Amino acid sequence: MESKLEEYILSHIDAEPDVLKKIDRDAHVKLLHTSMISGHLQGRLLRMLTRMIRPERVLEIGTFVGYSTLCFAEGLEENGEVHTIEIDDELEDYVRSNLALSEYGNKIKLHIGDAVQIIPGFEDGSFDLAFIDADKELYWEYFEATLPKIRKGGFILVDNTLWYGKVVEKVESSDRATQGILNFNERLAYDDRVEKVILPIRDGITVIRKK
């Protein structure tokens, strides 16, 4: 997105909460791969979608620093909860300290481990909303594991589905992340178990509704 247009958008939407500003700022100082953080625009979108869907339980695959996790928690009703899964155990203390900064941190349950192994332990149909934002090579596996856990009429959001525009470029066979995104997009397009639409926001977000 052009910088001037992005500045205009960010100045005409709800402000980024101070806690999230701090989490974003600290991550840029202390960590690598900070492009994985949702950021102001996408964060406000996630909160808005959560308030529209009004879920009781949210499942997030890929916590990273907890930014998007807190956006979901912020959008929940009083008794709602977010279950978030992070595979990198070295991030656990860092994430917990970030979640503790927010008044919504008590709505979040952090699971450390491989999502493909953790998700089957949840009851089928027990989540209203899920967010997939983890290893791109495994997107289809995450989706297949998650779909049974979503109630009928529930939603799955999938991040990065336009992947820096690489989805319309020639892709090297060695680019496994892009191949994973392409595989997910192609298979989802013909999956009649769900309704789906890709939003060209940031790096692409696919909104999926379970029939």
Where are these regions (language model features)?
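A short alpha-helical cap/connector motif
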Residues: M1-L129, K136-L157, T161-K211
